[in-house]
């Protein structure tokens, strides 16, 4: 049996997270609610074979960060903190929690605006949105009284982990970037080997006013089957834990709530998903004493050159690039044993 803390319900639409007419219409069209998301998360975590504590950590403006804590009583080791990617939540680390927490504290939380954390209104300015995310991470750290941490982020979480490390370098013992989003600049269309087809450009222009996952909410009661059809690979990735649609149900309920973090992400991007403020333009300013490890899937369709670029920008600092064979973008789920082992090796270089 898992040792759980008394759970305080988090209203994912609190702190002014409304989105006008669409939000008011969603409950009657989309078969979801905060209770549905809670149940979906509990199904994701019920197969995690180790004890943990869960808590809504309070930060400013009445917001709360939904958090899981593993081996938090081990005070002799630097804690590992996991930041999920866009469209995800802490439940997607289900294949990693037990192994990673064998000898050190591990914390995972839903980013502000995602999962079961509060879903406030974000600024429309990309720099300010980034700062809001970074400050929420810092307030979370202060609330839990963590002195230093090994900060690991996947996808959007990698971008935010790097942004946090730039602003609060004294709090980061090692930065681990897993298939990070938002590092390279968007290439000029003229420089691309394969120009973007006209129909894709037209579709991108048509969808510009909408959030990236608006289609799921527009699909209403058909949204879950849409996730199952578009991403059947997620069911395969977690087949060692679940035989049913637990994972796709979790992803669905994470992404049809109030689109707070989703809107924030949209405000940080330019067409086709590139970052407005690419991290490679700034990562050279990271404190030279912070070691950086970049983990990518050898089969990923995402640009895998960021590690090499970071090395060239930090020639006198520790930067290591690690390829996980047989893994795509979701490295931690594609090859969890290999991923866990590599992360533990990195952590052991800290203490």
Swiss-Prot record:
Q: What is this protein called?
A: 1-acylglycerol-3-phosphate O-acyltransferase ABHD5
Q: Which GO terms describe its biological process?
A: cell differentiation; fatty acid metabolic process; lipid metabolic process; negative regulation of triglyceride storage; phosphatidic acid biosynthetic process; positive regulation of lipid catabolic process; positive regulation of triglyceride catabolic process
Modes of activity regulation:
Acyltransferase activity is inhibited by detergents such as Triton X-100 and 3-[(3-cholamidopropyl)dimethylammonio]-1-propanesulfonate (CHAPS). Acyltransferase activity is inhibited by the presence of magnesium and calcium.
Q: Which Pfam families match?
A: Abhydrolase_1
Its subcellular locations are: Cytoplasm; Lipid droplet; Cytoplasm, Cytosol
The EC number of this protein is 2.3.1.51
Q: Which family does it belong to?
A: Belongs to the peptidase S33 family. ABHD4/ABHD5 subfamily.
Coiled-coil positions are: none
Its Gene Ontology molecular function terms? 1-acylglycerol-3-phosphate O-acyltransferase activity; lipase activator activity
The UniProt note on temperature reads: Preincubation of the enzyme for 10 minutes at temperatures above 35 degrees Celsius decreases acyltransferase activity subsequently measured at 30 degrees Celsius. Acyltransferase activity is reduced by approximately 60% following 10 minutes preincubation at47 degrees Celsius.
Domain of life assignment: Eukaryota
Please list the residue ranges annotated as the AB hydrolase-1 domain.
Answer: 79-184
Q: What class of enzyme is it?
A: transferase
Which PANTHER family does this chain map to? 1-ACYLGLYCEROL-3-PHOSPHATE O-ACYLTRANSFERASE ABHD5, RE40534P-RELATED
Which species is listed as the source?
Mus musculus (Mouse)
Q: What does this protein do?
A: Coenzyme A-dependent lysophosphatidic acid acyltransferase that catalyzes the transfer of an acyl group on a lysophosphatidic acid. Functions preferentially with 1-oleoyl-lysophosphatidic acid followed by 1-palmitoyl-lysophosphatidic acid, 1-stearoyl-lysophosphatidic acid and 1-arachidonoyl-lysophosphatidic acid as lipid acceptor. Functions preferentially with arachidonoyl-CoA followed by oleoyl-CoA as acyl group donors. Functions in phosphatidic acid biosynthesis. May regulate the cellular storage of triacylglycerol through activation of the phospholipase PNPLA2.
């Amino acid at each position: 049996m898992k040792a759980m803390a008394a759970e305080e319900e988090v209203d994912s639409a609190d702190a002014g997270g409304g989105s006008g007419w669409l939000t008011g219409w969603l409950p009657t069209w989309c078969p979801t609610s905060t209770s549905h998301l809670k149940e979906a998360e509990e199904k994701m975590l019920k197969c995690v074979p180790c004890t943990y504590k869960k808590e809504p950590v309070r930060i400013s403006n009445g917001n709360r960060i939904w958090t899981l804590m593993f081996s938090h009583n081990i005070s002799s080791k630097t804690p590992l903190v996991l930041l999920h990617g866009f469209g995800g939540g802490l439940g997607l680390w289900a294949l990693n929690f037990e192994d990673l927490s064998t000898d050190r504290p591990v914390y995972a939380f839903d980013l502000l605006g995602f999962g079961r954390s509060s879903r406030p209104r974000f600024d429309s300015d990309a720099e300010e949105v980034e700062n809001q995310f970074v400050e929420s991470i810092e307030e979370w750290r202060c609330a839990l009284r963590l002195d230093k941490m090994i900060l690991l982020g996947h996808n959007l979480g990698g971008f935010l982990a790097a942004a946090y490390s730039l602003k609060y370098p004294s709090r980061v013992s090692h930065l681990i970037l897993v298939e990070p989003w938002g590092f390279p600049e968007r290439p000029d269309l003229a420089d691309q080997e394969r120009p973007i087809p006209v129909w894709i450009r037209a579709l991108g222009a048509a969808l510009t006013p909408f959030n990236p996952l608006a289609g799921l909410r527009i699909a209403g009661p058909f949204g879950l089957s849409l996730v199952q059809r578009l991403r059947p690979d997620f069911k395969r990735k977690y087949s060692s834990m679940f035989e049913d649609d637990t994972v796709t149900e979790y992803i669905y309920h994470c992404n049809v709530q109030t689109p707070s973090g989703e809107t924030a992400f949209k405000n940080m991007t330019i067409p086709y998903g590139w970052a407005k403020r690419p991290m490679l333009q700034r990562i050279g300013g990271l404190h030279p004493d912070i070691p950086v490890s970049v983990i990518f899937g050898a089969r990923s369709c995402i640009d895998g050159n960021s590690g090499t670029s970071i090395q060239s920008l930090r020639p006198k600092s520790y930067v290591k690039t690690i390829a996980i064979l047989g893994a795509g973008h979701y490295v931690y789920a594609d090859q969890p044993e290999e991923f866990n082992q590599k992360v533990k090796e990195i952590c052991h270089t800290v203490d």
